[in-house]
Amino acid sequence: MILLDSKLENLRRTIARHQSCAVAFSGGVDSTLVLKVAHELLAGKVIAVTALSESLPSGELEEAAELARIIGVEHVVIQTFETRDKDYLANAANRCYFCKTEMYARIGDFARDHGIGAILDGLNVDDLTDRRPGRAAAIERGVISPLVEANLTKAEVRELSREFGLPTWDKPALACLSSRIPHGTPITLESLSQVDRAERFLKTLGVGQVRVRHHGDTARIEVEPVDFSLLHEHRSDIQTNFKPLGFLRVEIDPDGYRCGVSLPAPLAMGSNTPVDIQVGSIIRSIPLPLLTRIDNAS
């Protein structure tokens, strides 16, 4: 606890160096903590800025707006246009660089127009162990990562958020919709809409952490293992709702949800002829790259 208190003080010192700031605000656990501390130190000189585009999952903008209201910070929404960038749409491994370049350019323009001195993000030290092309864009634009400067891990961010009474302390990790599409597969507005609508439906069933990975006419569902039985229980509803979206095959990844995974398309199973595949009564553990097939078995 003493170490965590020391890190919190480092976080405060990092933010207090600035007279005003714009927080790149997704409404996730990390940026919410940054916004909360910034508001305590720079009340009236902090603005939460959320980027809106087709890659933002449904409901996240509304959640971000409500969080900003709870904290007491002005919330601004800026439109970004990464989906018009051919480099972004190509969906190479460095896709995030082009997204973040666009986002920070727009936030930078806003900050300059409003006399805001600094742009803060919610990167934490655990994120530095991942391959993050977007980090280069942040550095190029002079974006400050106060959680990194305070050496705060994701777990510590959650603990501090809990102590502050923030509702995001246990919020599942966020990621843009494009992360559901394997690298090398071009991104389209249609594919983004497909995964967004599919995930939105699954959440109405009570599923917690969820990703619907897009593999053409195949949807690969990743949920926490505790939710496997819930998918089985609603197998007919899943089929009914996924088919109109263009998903003729539905598969459950037996390893469950994994953050930041971008796997190649699943191997074909059975006939190559597109068929309706319902959720079966058995979820079989099949080593990757094979995935659990959801079929008509009873």
Question: PLM features: residue spans?
Answer:
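A short interface-forming secondary-structure element
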Residues: 214-216, 220-232
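Short glycine/threonine-rich loop-to-helix capping motif typified by GTGT followed
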Residues: 186-192, 224-229, 261-268
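Flexible glycine/acidic-rich beta-alpha junction loops that bind and position SAM and/or redox cofactors
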Residues: 173-185, 218-222, 255-262
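Mid-to-C-terminal catalytic subdomains of enzymes
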Residues: 148-154, 158-202, 206-211
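Long, low-complexity, intrinsically disordered segments
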Residues: 284-298
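C-terminal boundary motif of the adenylate-forming
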Residues: 208-215, 253-254
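ATP-dependent adenylation/nucleotidyltransferase module used to activate substrates
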Residues: 1-163, 204, 219, 237-247, ...
